[in-house]
Structures are given as C-alpha cells and as structure tokens.
Design a protein with these regions (language model features):
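Short amphipathic alpha-helical interaction segments
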Residues: 54-69
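Long, low-complexity, charge-rich intrinsically disordered regions
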Residues: 3, 90-187
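Short C-terminal boundary/hinge segments that cap the last helix of small helical domains
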Residues: 1-10
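A glycine-rich, hydrophobic loop/mini-helix early in the fold
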Residues: 8, 28-29
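Short acidic, hydrophobic short linear motifs in intrinsically disordered regions
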Residues: 39-52
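Pre-recognition alpha-helix immediately N-terminal to the DNA-recognition helix
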Residues: 30-34
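Short, cationic-aromatic polyanion-contact patches
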Residues: 16-28, 44, 74-99
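A contiguous binding-surface segment within folded domains or other stable secondary-structure elements
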Residues: 43, 61-62, 71-74
Length: 187
C-alpha cells in the first residue's frame, strides 16, 4: 500500500506557487525559511547539515513542518520529494518576497558584481507591449536554465560548486531620476 501511495503522490502535479498561508508559515521561523530555501534548491539533508548551523533535530523539525505545510513529502532517512516545481515563484506581494525586499535585496545589490563569473546589468528602454511578453518568457527560461544547471551540478563534490544567486526582473517602470526630468504637457 505504501508503494501505491508513493506512486500516486509522485503523479500529483507540482505547485507553481505557494499559498499565502504556506508562505506565512515559512517566514514565521528563520530556520524553517533556511530549510525551505534549501529544499526548493533540492539540497540533500546531509548537505544542509554540513553547510548550515542546524542540529539534526532542528532539521528534522523543519522538514516535518514543510511536510505538514505541503511543500515536501518527507520520506524515511530525512529524504523528501519536493511538491513545488523547481521553477516555482514566490507570491509577488507575499510574505517571502516581502522578506527578500526587506532583508535581502539591499545586501545583494550592495555587492560589487566584479568577482569571477559575476555581472550586473541594468538596461532601460521602451519596447512594444507585445514584445514585452516575449522578453518576459525568455527571462523565465533563463531562470529555468539556471535552476536546471543547479540540479545537474548537484552531482559535483561540494568543493567544486559555489553559491550563485540570479535576480531576474522586468517591469514597466521609470526610475525617479528620469521621471522627475520628464516633460509634462505644460512644458
């Protein structure tokens, strides 16, 4: 019966985003958030313990909570099956993105982006609305390619991998410095 239940669970579609309640639960506890980020990156329990200051009991507690919340299906030996797609996105105005905006973005962009394999590029332009969707889809594919490479490189020894984070964004927006200088109909 357990094998049948596992096969049924394995055929369930993966979530593309979490619910508001799931995200609230994740950000309510810093250790749970760290473990949630690790499992959405599909890191094995052994690597999480080797990398972060967590006891095995704290990890098991977090994995159990993530199972209860519906983000993973916890299996024997602290193994798990992710219930969210690798390319899932946090709710744009949800608790996790609010956490990132408040506590992560400044730290991320304060870096020099001048290290090996690093870059920062800000491009401003005006394009047709139809092409904007095409660019958005291409940017989403870049994010998915990065996620796929991360998964493929999990077979490399830890000392041959480095953590990278990409932030991909595109929105109809004009920075304040440009907006302040923009001509009005009265000019």
């Amino acid at each position: 019966f357990a094998d049948l239940a596992r096969r049924v669970a394995d055929t369930q579609p993966l979530l593309l985003e979490l619910t508001l309640a799931q995200e609230k639960a994740v950000v309510a506890d810093r250790k749970l958030l760290i473990v949630a980020i690790c499992v959405t990156s599909q890191l094995p329990a052994e690597e999480i313990l080797a990398t972060y200051r967590l006891t095995e009991a704290e990890l098991v507690k977090a994995l159990t909570q993530l199972d209860r919340i519906g983000i993973i299906d916890l299996r024997p030996g602290n193994r798990y099956r992710l219930k969210v797609a690798k390319g899932f996105r946090w709710l744009p105005q949800g608790p996790v993105m609010s956490f990132f905006r408040k506590e992560v973005l400044h730290d991320y962009f304060a870096g020099g982006f001048d290290g090996e394999s690093e870059m920062l590029m800000v491009v401003h332009g005006e394009i047709g609305r139809g092409l904007a969707n095409s660019f958005r889809e291409r940017l989403m594919r870049i994010g998915q390619d990065f996620s796929n490479q991360h998964l493929a490189d999990q077979k490399l020894p830890a000392d041959q991998r480095r953590p990278y984070t990409i932030v991909i964004g595109m929105r109809s927006w004009l920075m304040a410095a440009l907006a302040e200088m923009q001509r009005t109909s009265e000019d």
